[in-house]
Amino acid sequence: MTKTLRVAVIGAGRMGADHIKRLSTRIHGAEVAAVVDVDLARAQAAIEGIDRAVALASADEALNNGDVNAVLIATPGFLHEEILYKALEKDFPILCEKPLTPDAGSAWKVVQAEQALGHKRIQVGFMRRFDAEYSALGAIIRNSELGELLMLHHQHRNPSTPEGFTNEMLINDSVVHEFDAIRFFTGEEITSVQVRLGKPTRSAPSGQHDPQHVLLETESGVLADVEIYVNAKFGYQVATQASFEEGIVSIGSDNGPYVQTAGKWGGNVTPGFEERFGAAYDVEVQAWVDAALRGEIGGPTAWDGYATAACCEAGVEAQKSGEKVKVQLNTKPDLYK
């Protein structure tokens, strides 16, 4: 059995660079063997100071490198599908940043390819499942400590959006995390999505309606709502309140130092997702490595990637129509049950 994962990180942009640093400094049982980027200079800069790592310009070079036995995909989503097929052919353990692929049709093809392999090889990077507060709330739900879960209320707020962040990206790039969180908390599929567009902020760029209110329902009737507000200015905030038969649980509050000075009181707001979920990323990658070294794959699966893609498609349709849209899912293969 493999004692060390020799990982090819494909994509050396913001997320890829963060994972390269993580693998080379904080993760046990894994090493960076190769970094791939179309900008070879960026790949070379990313491996500086990492022993035995090579910079490459193509995923094929990395996958055929005899020193590589695992793959972490951090490229833009539209490039994932081809890399996933080739990594599955090698039977490598794969950690794929979300999305699995950009649409449900191609994601389903990846699910079928993995199913044909006969065992799971893909973990999808929904890192919130590994956050300590998310894990704690999940345990409360699973153990029925407060009775049955009835409703979920989510807030997802960003200080601003980069240039080119479209209306559809509020669903595909942001609410996608809540889609997975709701499925994680309830253990159920989301059956319908509705999007309501209210009064927009003046800070929203042209062509973007912000904020939006997303309403969802699960198989057992759990209702969930998401406030997505991506130009909130004040900082980054991801919070959830869960309503049970016998109580309420809230997670995601900023609980840093509370300061009183010079006639003022208060604390600091988390500036971005790296600060809020940095520890969760570490736990996520370590869990992937530990499972891969046992010959297993844990965490969010290719099915989870497919199901969230289907939710996103329903969400974008609901954005445009204003109607409640049914989430269309194929039958779940036995491999993921």
Curated annotation (Swiss-Prot):
It catalyses: myo-inositol + NAD(+) = scyllo-inosose + NADH + H(+). InterPro entries: Gfo-Idh-MocA_inositol_DH (IPR050424), Gfo/Idh/MocA-like_OxRdtase_C (IPR004104), Gfo/Idh/MocA-like_OxRdtase_N (IPR000683), MI/DCI_dehydrogenase (IPR023794), NAD(P)-bd_dom_sf (IPR036291). Its EC number is 1.1.1.18. It comes from the Bacteria. Keywords: NAD, Oxidoreductase. GO terms for biological process: inositol catabolic process. GO terms for molecular function: inositol 2-dehydrogenase (NAD+) activity; nucleotide binding. It holds the Pfam family GFO_IDH_MocA. Homotetramer. PANTHER family: INOSITOL 2-DEHYDROGENASE, PTHR43593. HAMAP family: IolG (MF_01671). Belongs to the Gfo/Idh/MocA family. Involved in the oxidation of myo-inositol (MI) to 2-keto-myo-inositol (2KMI or 2-inosose). This is Inositol 2-dehydrogenase 1. It comes from Paenarthrobacter aurescens (strain TC1).
